[in-house]
Amino acid sequence: MGSETKHSAKVKIVTRESPPSAKEHMRPTKTQILVPPTQSLPNGKKPNFGKSTKQRREPRERTSKTGHEDDKATMVTVNIDAFLHDKAPKKKSCKYKKKKTRQYQDRAAASIDSKPHVAGHTAFAGASFTTDIPHEAALPKPSFV
């Protein structure tokens, strides 16, 4: 009988660990306070109990947008002038930097190129490339007899 009570206890634990229903998963809603129907105030307006008022677009905004486009165009030209003005001295500094790097690259190329040239001249010092080709001279000439 002791084993049966343990089993029944396990069943209860399993049912408690089972996933809750969909309603329990939902986010708890705010408590809604019942407000009596809005009555007009002495000034004629209805009270606003913490509700956000919707801002309505006015046709004036559409006409003001065209004015803003003109302002944007003038701002763009001013920014371009400032951009070009700022870029002018930077280009000069870039030129000086490029010259320095070119000189460094030329020096590096000269030091690298000087070694292969010496090796190349020593390897083919006695060969003339017009008539003497070593790999063809080593091959036997076919005889058509």
From Swiss-Prot:
Coiled-coil intervals: none
Gene Ontology cellular component terms for the protein in this record: cytoplasm; nucleolus; nucleus
Subcellular location: Cytoplasm; Nucleus
Compositionally biased region (Polar residues): 29-42
Record-linked InterPro entries: PNRC-like_rgn
The keyword Nucleus is assigned to this record: yes
Basic residues bias (residue ranges): 89-102
GO molecular function: mRNA binding
Region (Disordered): 1-74, 89-115
GO biological process terms, semicolon-separated: deadenylation-dependent decapping of nuclear-transcribed mRNA; mRNA processing; nuclear-transcribed mRNA catabolic process, nonsense-mediated decay; positive regulation of translation in response to stress
Cytoplasm among keywords: yes
Keywords, alphabetical: Cytoplasm, mRNA processing, Nonsense-mediated mRNA decay, Nucleus, RNA-binding
Basic and acidic residues compositional bias, start-end: 55-73
Physiological role: mRNA-binding protein which stimulates mRNA decapping by DCP1 and DCP2.
Note: Present with 538 molecules/cell in log phase SD medium.
Family per record: Belongs to the EDC family.
Protein name, as recorded: Enhancer of mRNA-decapping protein 2
Origin species: Saccharomyces cerevisiae (strain ATCC 204508 / S288c)
